């Protein structure tokens, strides 16, 4: 409805109210938007009609006819919407024209305010000039109240009326679009929504059940872990007992170790006793005198016996020093003839140097820090002992 305040406000207030806004700038922007939207709707309707005409030849059957009918209805509705939009630019254009008309018809606010200022000054000086300014004061009131006020009020009211009419035109709703799908589409959409809700509820229930099972499995795993922890603690508690059981056999082995210590200490004494019991172990196997010179065979046997005895001593003495053999120098013994002339020795006769076997010296094994025994007879000359040479006398009966 029109604004009833136009007649109640002063002329300058109405003019300021009309010109206080943004002017026609917003009206022009709105008009351009409506024009663009209408052109878009028209272009879409035309394109849809062309597409329908181009593809209708390849459609067959009842479905093809129904589809073509639906497309035609939708295109008609789109064109109707475009027609509804086409009205809006004209409405906005009318509003722009109404504003410009009202703005031009309004008495400007400065003019109205100047009238009031002059009226006030005249009233102030009128008594001093013997009321000669009274006609001017009356004319100012007539102009202000008889012309400016009614004019601005009328212009504002007219402008308000035009805008009210245009607002009613803008309030007309757009045409209702026809249903391009099946009439059962809303019911199917509602069923789809219900099915989606049911599936969502079922999914929530399954998730809740899974979470419950998972929580139960977690509790069972925790119980099993608690049992394992108890078993570990029990085994830890039994470890001191196992250590005690392992220490008992070691304690029983200690007395046997104490018995073995004296036996180990007696082993050097036993070795010394065995050494004195066996002369060969002390290197005395070679000290036996040589065999009689009565027969060569007996001498050879005695020499062999001496060597055997020395070998036995070496065998009993151990492997501390290897057995050595040597032949005494010739200057240490008498010659075979002792300076007496003898006949020629027949072949096959044995002399002293042949019968006498080489002296064998066997070293003993060091026992308990004792020095190694000297070879039997090997170093007797150095100790001043006399050596008795073994000789063989051969009698030649062929004379």
From Swiss-Prot:
Disordered: region residues: 375-399
Pfam family, one: PPE
Domain of life: Bacteria
Family label: Belongs to the mycobacterial PPE family.
Name of the protein described by the UniProt record: Uncharacterized PPE family protein PPE69
Naturally occurring in which organism (per UniProt): Mycobacterium tuberculosis (strain ATCC 25618 / H37Rv)
Gene: PPE69
